[in-house]
A protein has these predicted regions:
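Structured C-terminal subdomain patch of bacterial secreted/periplasmic proteins
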Residues: 31-47, 52-54, 58, 135-199
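A conserved helix-loop-strand patch within extracytoplasmic ligand-binding domains
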Residues: 7, 26-52, 61-73, 78
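Binding-cleft/active-site segments that stabilize strongly anionic ligands or cofactors
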Residues: 1-27, 66-178
Length: 199
């Protein structure tokens, strides 16, 4: 993110006397849910609100630990998850990111795609055969998102896809699942409930 061709390097800001904090929960490095907690603590220290930040970080850590305890009691093959967006007229967009992959790994699940893609079709969806579909609502797809899931799940072509057949299509907002903040933990808890009932 911090490159000369985009917003400038960290060094260039520092040379101007502008302090820079680069989040651990970042698209630039491999991820862990614990990075979110550490960012909260670090930002609390930067803004001199350590007590409030540490209390919030402790709460987040407790939720992560509780979630990991639940996951550790389960066994079986990882469930296949598809992050889908922009469904319209039989085509869709698929997402993958380091944080979403980290979240899935923590839940004993995996993204059906190594990387995202545009212009995917229902035939692609059938081939992916996901156990769970996370339909990601986004502002840029606002015109079609309102009835996208209904249109998808009623299409005859995909009725044997496990996520459709077992009614495992979850709707989430883009920021809740694709960004790198505390809301990812909310999404992980929501997704765990679907994974638990799908396994």
């Amino acid at each position: 993110m911090f490159t000369e061709s985009s917003i400038g390097t960290v060094q260039s800001y520092q040379e101007l006397g502008i302090p820079v904090y680069t989040e651990l929960a970042s698209a630039s490095i491999d991820q862990s849910l614990d990075n979110i907690v550490e960012d909260v603590r670090n930002i609390g220290e930067i803004f001199n609100v350590q007590e409030t930040a540490n209390a919030y970080a402790d709460e987040l850590q407790e939720r992560i630990d509780a979630l990991m305890d639940k996951v550790s009691s389960q066994s079986g093959e990882p469930l296949k998850v598809l992050f889908m967006a922009g469904y319209a007229d039989g085509t869709f967009v698929a997402f993958n990111s380091k944080m979403s992959s980290c979240m899935l790994n923590a839940l004993n699940a995996e993204n059906v795609l190594d990387k995202g893609g545009n212009g995917l079709t229902l035939e692609n969806l059938v081939s992916m055969n996901p156990d769970i579909i996370v339909y990601v609502r986004a502002d840029r797809f606002g015109a079609t998102d309102a009835d996208a899931v209904e249109q998808l799940t009623s299409n005859a072509v995909v009725q044997e896809v496990p996520a459709i057949a077992n009614q495992k299509v979850i709707e989430m907002d883009y920021d809740d699942v694709m960004d790198y903040g505390a809301r990812v933990i909310d999404s992980a808890e929501t997704l765990y409930n679907s994974c638990d009932s799908a396994s």
